[in-house]
Amino acid sequence: MTIKEIAMKKAEMFKAENGDSYLIAVSDTRNTVAIHEIPVDVFPTLDIFTMTEKEKTVKLSIRAIKDWKKIIESFPKVATFDRKVIDNALEKGQTEKGKSKVNYGHALEHILFNTSFTEILASQSEVDGIYNGKKVQVKASLVTWNKTTGKNNSASIATVCEMNKALFE
C-alpha cells in the first residue's frame, strides 16, 4: 500500500458520509491561526503526507514543514482566529476532559461548531460539522504553540487517519 492509496481510502470514507472538504488550520502569524479549505477530491492528491506502519495499522500524517504549509496555504483561507481564542478553548476542554484527551483539533471544533467537548470526544463520524454549508473534517494539530517561550513547538504533526492494514488486502 502506498501513501496515495491510504489518502484515497480516507477520502472515500469521508465522502461516504457526504463529506465535502477538509479544514486545515495552520499558524498564520505569531498571534493568529488561519483555516484553509481543501476539497475532499483534491486532498488525497496533495504531496503533503507521511506514512508510519505498525504491525496491524498504518497511519497517515501531515507535518508542519515549510513546503507543505505553502501547499496548504495555496487553498482558500476561510477563517482566521486569534491564537488566544483557540488556546482558551483548548484549556477549557483539557480542564473538563483531561489534558491527554483534548487537542487543538477538538478546541477548533468546539469554536467552529459550538459542540461540547463531550460530544466531540464521543463522535465516531468522519464529518466533524457543517461550515459554510459544507460537511467538513477539521485538522488543527499543525498550530501547536509553546505559550511560555512564545515560539512554535517545532514541526508539529496532524494525524489524518490510522487504519487497519486489512482494509487494503
Where are the regions a protein language model picked out?
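Nucleic-acid endonuclease domains
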Residues: M1-E169
